[in-house]
């Protein structure tokens, strides 16, 4: 799993403040729109179902967006797309963070020690959107380390509703194995397509 420092995550919040302070003398519909969604060809489709056509972008944000399947984006909605659908807009992409996407694991298909490993992890946020269950997580790492950290969501058998367990394999890079002067916190976004598992319109879910 590629980790992203807290500084990078905070970038979106900083840009949002700048956008809110901008003087709205143009025809821009909205500044500082923050949303998660999927990349579809050269467009971005938000979890709310809006289609964003990237007509302007900062730096390499657009190129980086096209290299991923799912992302958390900060953009300015400039205008409705001429001749487009009712939910289609031209936007300026200001920042983006890649979102890791993984299928949900069942113990019937996977039951290895690596999958079941439960090293400490801090779930800072969890929400449902776009057919996914999304997490923002943090965990300890050694500064400059390239040690891979693996995240999985395991579906467990239950007679009442659905029960899921988020697991973390730190590959030995845990708090007790990191010198105190080399310890930092890293984290990132991860999404699991829960609509592949839950088909009911209403369901009881525990994580």
What function would you assign to each model-found segment?
Residues 1-10:
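Bacterial N-terminal signal peptides that target proteins for export
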Residues 33-207:
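First exposed extracellular module after export/assembly in secreted or surface-exposed proteins
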């Amino acid at each position: 799993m590629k980790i992203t420092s807290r500084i990078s995550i905070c970038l979106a919040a900083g840009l949002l403040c700048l956008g809110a302070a901008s003087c709205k003398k143009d025809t821009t519909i909205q500044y500082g729109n923050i949303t998660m969604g999927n990349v579809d060809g050269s467009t971005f489709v938000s979890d709310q179902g809006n289609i964003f056509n990237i007509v302007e972008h900062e730096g390499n944000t657009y190129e980086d967006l096209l290299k991923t399947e799912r992302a958390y984006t900060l953009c300015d909605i400039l205008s409705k797309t001429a001749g487009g659908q009712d939910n289609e807009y031209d936007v300026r992409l200001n920042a983006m963070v890649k979102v890791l996407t993984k299928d949900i694991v069942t113990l019937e298909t996977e039951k290895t020690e690596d999958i079941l490993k439960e090293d400490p992890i801090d779930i800072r946020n969890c929400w449902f959107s776009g057919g996914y269950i999304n997490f923002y997580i943090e965990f300890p790492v050694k500064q400059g380390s390239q040690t891979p950290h693996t995240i999985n969501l395991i579906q467990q058998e239950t007679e009442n509703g659905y029960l899921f367990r988020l697991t973390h394999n730190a590959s030995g890079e845990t708090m007790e194995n990191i010198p105190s002067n080399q310890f930092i916190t890293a984290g990132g976004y991860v999404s699991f397509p829960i609509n592949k598992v839950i088909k009911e319109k209403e369901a009881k879910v525990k994580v």
